[in-house]
């Protein structure tokens, strides 16, 4: 990723994965981009074909993992193919930490 990402002053990046991301939030969308795990949210940035940024905030939402799918509230994010980053570490960090 070559662009600057703006995070909140009290937000810390725990892990990042770049790859093919499948997002279901009522509609199925597939993007190639960066998936950031912070202490406050999952943040997706895609600059290929279309510029897209999407945040899934943890506050007040149930979060879980089901068959390698990250669940935040009613939203499901699946990493279908990881180009870079440690996906296993990312999944473990997501499931082990309570924010």
PLM feature spans:
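Intrinsic-disorder-associated interaction segments
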Residues: 6, 80-83
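Short, surface-exposed beta-strand-loop junctions and turns on beta-sheet-rich folds
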Residues: 48-53, 76-78, 85
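Phosphoinositide-dependent membrane-docking surfaces
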Residues: 41-44, 52-69
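Residue-level signal for tight coil/turn positions that link beta-strands
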Residues: 32, 39-40, 67, 74
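Anionic N-terminal interaction surfaces
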Residues: 1-35, 75, 88-99
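Short hydrophobic/aromatic-rich beta-strand segments that constitute the beta-sheet cores
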Residues: 42-46, 72, 79
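Short coil/turn linker and secondary-structure boundary residues
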Residues: 60, 82-85
């Amino acid at each position: 990723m070559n662009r600057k990402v703006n995070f909140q002053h009290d937000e810390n990046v725990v892990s990042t994965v770049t790859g093919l991301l499948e997002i279901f939030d009522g509609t199925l969308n597939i993007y190639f981009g960066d998936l950031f795990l912070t202490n406050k949210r999952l943040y997706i940035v895609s600059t290929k074909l279309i510029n897209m940024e999407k945040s899934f905030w943890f506050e007040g939402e149930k979060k879980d993992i089901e068959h390698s799918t990250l669940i935040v509230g009613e939203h499901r994010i699946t990493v279908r193919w990881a180009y870079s980053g440690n996906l296993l570490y990312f999944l473990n960090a997501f499931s082990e930490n309570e924010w």
